[in-house]
């Protein structure tokens, strides 16, 4: 078993697990930390950003073509790239994504790179996710694409990606890595095509993968529809512990029972804010919000259009009334705002028990339905469709994007940033708030960092791992050492789990200590009826048997031996025959590739393409839509149900293998 780490950061995981001739992708996270290096996409021709001076140096001017393609701008004492922000999808050079059999998505935050794979990599396998994950993930993608497309950015070349240019830049730009793999966002068409390929699953639903593994999703408690995935064969159990939560919020609680006693447990998604308690941060959020409103200022909350947002609305529903601020308007601005709020109210079976009860009464499970009914919460898709006519201050505005590089949050930063009465409150932990604010400096408005991250912290994760008792633990290497900003906090690590441990980093290929010890074999009825068990001691009976082991669709069947049938002397047909004895053939040695190709051509299979790598051979038969995989220990024939073709290939193979 091997694990390939093709994701670029711990917070945006993308892993490929190779097990029993299958390739399983676990999550498809998109690294968006790269957008911090770009100037914001402003809705209007902003004076500050439009008048930024280009930056250069003597070394850069000597590089041919740089001056004509100089995208570097200086703002707030540091450099930014003045172009459409680019993101970093999973690494494509480590493994061929067209060979991936299935993609398992754990939550809607970890599927944002999916269009890059489904539309541009040759992938044609299956994708599984829960219904809320599919719909809310679609909303997140469409919001991002809308933000990017409505503010077209003039492209002035990619000279800034040149290695010689990067070496001449000041920090942090000179520390950038993998810039050649950065890409602009996909299109709305890509999103729709991608979403159409995802198959919805329910919790605990059993999915068959090539007859080898049973896949099932189980609640992780992190967000609506979030899942931990279980991969089970007859004798192995592999668990993927994705971002999970033990806090009692709106999703179904974490189902940890199914994760116990795994042969391999892969853990990702421990909190990005390890020293910040979500309940305490929620209290700080409300306190800062109320103090700003009482002073006549406005509050901007850069956020995603789902997730913690629902909990913030629920908190403000009662808090503003108790603070005698019930008449302060709350605005939720997003291209997918209506869709997000609507879905939150109809996914009753994915909610915690208390909210499920409300759905069946029937009552709205979330209080934001009451806020909408009372016109205290007002929803807009953008700033120019009726927003200005209902806009009143002081107010609270929830809008995207948390990075402050896309969306309507950029506009509010521009118009409110000059006043010290206003406050921007960061609740999403995915983007360092100082990085997000950097291009807006100097800034008069107050800033508050209240990261509300319900994911497991290290103490909770360590407690959970002791209860789950896996035989082998796999985790990012960064979990084994304290965070960079808290180097002395040794408690902010995954402790010795009491089992074997494998850690990984970006682009690592980890060999996991699990091998195929047993396989289930079914004995054919014809063979089992011939068995004559002999009792050797009470409760134990044994019998010898001889048969032919048949492998098809990764299922093993023991069939009766074939008989060598010859016509009787003097007979013209094969109707009358005598049993000359059982056919006994023992194969040994290796297949000679040239002999095998000749044997195929002798049987009419002439269109043969061979690819060889490290002792392994892949033989493509384009005309027959088939493929043969040969390696040192096994042979696989893939004919998509063409039994006649499979038999011809088998006979050609047997002709080339020594036997006695």
UniProtKB/Swiss-Prot annotation:
User: Which spans of this chain does the record mark as coiled coil?
Assistant: none
* UniProt record similarity statement: Belongs to the metallo-beta-lactamase superfamily. RNA-metabolizing metallo-beta-lactamase-like family. INTS9 subfamily.
Entry-linked Gene3D superfamilies: 3.40.50.10890, Ribonuclease Z/Hydroxyacylglutathione hydrolase-like
**What is the name listed in the Swiss-Prot or TrEMBL entry for this protein?**
Integrator complex subunit 9 homolog
| Keyword annotations of the record | Cytoplasm, Nucleus
Q: What does this protein do?
A: Component of the integrator complex, a multiprotein complex that terminates RNA polymerase II (Pol II) transcription in the promoter-proximal region of genes.
Q: Which gene encodes it?
A: ints9
A Pfam family of this chain = Lactamase_B_6
Key word Cell cycle present in the record? no
The cellular location(s) given in this protein's UniProt record come to: Nucleus; Cytoplasm
Spell out the SUPFAM superfamilies in the cross-references.
Metallo-hydrolase/oxidoreductase
Cellular compartments per GO CC: cytoplasm; INTAC complex; integrator complex; nucleus
Can you cite a GO biological process for this protein?
Answer: RNA polymerase II transcription initiation surveillance
The UniProt subunit note reads as follows: Component of the Integrator complex. The core complex associates with protein phosphatase 2A subunits, to form the Integrator-PP2A (INTAC) complex.
List the source organism.
Nematostella vectensis (Starlet sea anemone)
Which InterPro entries does the UniProt entry name for this protein? Beta_Casp (IPR022712), Integrator_9su (IPR027074), IntS9-like_C (IPR048660), Metallo-B-lactamas (IPR001279), RibonucZ/Hydroxyglut_hydro (IPR036866)
PANTHER family, per database record = INTEGRATOR COMPLEX SUBUNIT 9
